[in-house]
Amino acid sequence: KGNQARKAGAKEEILFLISQKNIVERWQNFIEHKEAGKRVAHHDTKISNVLFDETEKGICVIDLDTVMPGFFISDVGDMLRTYICPVSEEEKDLDKIFVRNEFIQAIQDGYFTEMKQCLSQFEQDHFLFSGEFLMYMQALRFLTDYLNNDIYYGKKYETHNLLRAQNQVQLLKEFQVNL
């Protein structure tokens, strides 16, 4: 299925994502583990869904239509995916994609300050996996949309979703180097 010409042009990304199937296996093991609990989650904690005051202090998360039961991985993973890189998923220059390790530490410290007592040790041990999983998932979603002729996310230009997928693949690679 999918657009064959686009498939040929996205071969490198397809092969990379297939090579990362261990992420899916780790996700499956996580959700089946007795210490992985479901709780209320936002499921879209990207930086553009955080409301800041005039001093740039975070006030609250907005866009609440995605709130439902889920695993902490969804919220933490999207925070890591969108906060640790200085550029967004829209960035065309892949050389600008890198991981700010101090942001990873700040997210972990801040999250654990408020939530550590709510997480099992098993969940705490999967904190960084959450970023890896969400980067992988978002790359896969952008690539799937590109291969299916941009029916979900839409596009501003012909290769928009391919570029978004490439962006997230690059971020995932950078993140994995830092694990």
Set out the residue ranges of the language-model regions.
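ATP-dependent phospho-/nucleotidyl transfer catalytic cores
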Residues: K1-H42, I47-T55, F133, I151-K156, ...
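A structural signal for short hydrophobic/aromatic patches embedded in well-ordered alpha helices
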Residues: L17, I107, H126-F127
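Catalytic activation segment of kinase domains across protein kinase-like and atypical kinase folds
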Residues: S48-S88
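Transmembrane helix-bundle signature of multi-pass membrane transporters/permeases
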Residues: M68, S130-L134
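Active-site activation/catalytic loop segments of kinase-like enzymes and analogous catalytic loops
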Residues: I73-Q117, F133-Y152
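All-alpha amphipathic helical-bundle segments outside canonical DNA-binding/catalytic cores
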Residues: L119-G131
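Helical subdomain adjoining the active site within ATP-dependent kinase catalytic cores
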Residues: R141-L179
